[in-house]
């Protein structure tokens, strides 16, 4: 549940795509970095956007977990192992965070009708990196939202979007996990 905060990514893959072979997925798995990048697109510097995210309570105690892509990479490992039945660790992820994204990068993306987003992807390779995403792409969400697109063998692309960063979102996902554990224990 804590993969995606208030967005039930694992539940969706487990239940809604049951019987479907997921061949790849990509998405925004860290609401904090999405919030920072959204604020940068609205004219803030990276530093000011980070300070604002801290004031809102979105940033991990160790900010490098968010801005250097460690949080997104850890979630990518969980998803790859759970959904794709891979056997990967954090060491298998190529990771580039948002620390070096500049206002110039943001403006360049905007001039291409795109936005810079920290995207975690599981194709042949596992990658977390800032990428230009076209404004019409369903992954181009703003604020603390998370989004993930599953590419499945028969159903094609399916995207789910929901709240990512924040105390209530995390609490919701933990409660969902606890209820799942309780249900599983009741079956035994």
What is each PLM-predicted segment?
Residues 42-46, 83-90, 180-186:
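Short helix-capping/linker segments at secondary-structure and domain boundaries
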Residues 2-59, 70-71, 78:
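Rossmann-like NAD(P)H-binding beta-loop-alpha module
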Residues 19-25, 124, 145-146, 154-157:
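Short coil/turn connectors at secondary-structure junctions
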Residues 1-2, 13, 28, 32, ...:
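Fold-independent oxyanion-binding glycine-rich loops
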Residues 4, 8, 20, 44-48, ...:
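Conserved active-site and cofactor/substrate-binding residues in soluble primary-metabolism enzymes
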Residues 23, 60-67, 160-165:
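A short glycine-threonine-serine/GTX helix/turn-capping micro-motif
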Residues 39, 50-147:
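Substrate-binding/catalytic subdomain of NAD(P)-dependent oxidoreductase enzymes
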Residues 136-188:
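ATP-dependent carboxylate/acyl-activation modules
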């Amino acid at each position: 549940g804590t993969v995606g905060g208030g967005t039930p990514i694992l539940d969706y893959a487990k239940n809604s795509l049951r019987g479907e072979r997921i061949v790849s997925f990509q998405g925004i798995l860290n609401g904090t970095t999405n919030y920072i990048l959204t604020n940068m697109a609205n004219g803030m510097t990276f530093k000011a956007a980070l300070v604002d995210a801290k004031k809102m309570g979105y940033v991990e105690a160790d900010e490098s977990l968010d801005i250097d892509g460690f949080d997104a990479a850890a979630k990518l490992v969980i998803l790859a192992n759970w959904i794709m039945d891979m056997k990967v660790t954090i060491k298998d992820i190529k990771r580039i965070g948002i620390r070096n994204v500049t206002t110039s990068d943001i403006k360049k993306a905007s001039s291409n009708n795109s936005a810079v987003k920290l995207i975690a992807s599981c194709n042949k390779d596992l990658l977390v990196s800032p990428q230009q995403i076209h404004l019409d792409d369903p992954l181009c969400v703003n604020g603390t939202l998370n989004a993930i697109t599953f590419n499945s063998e028969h159903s094609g692309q399916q995207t789910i979007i929901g709240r990512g960063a924040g105390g209530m979102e995390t609490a919701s996902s933990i409660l969902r996990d606890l209820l799942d554990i309780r249900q599983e224990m009741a079956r035994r």
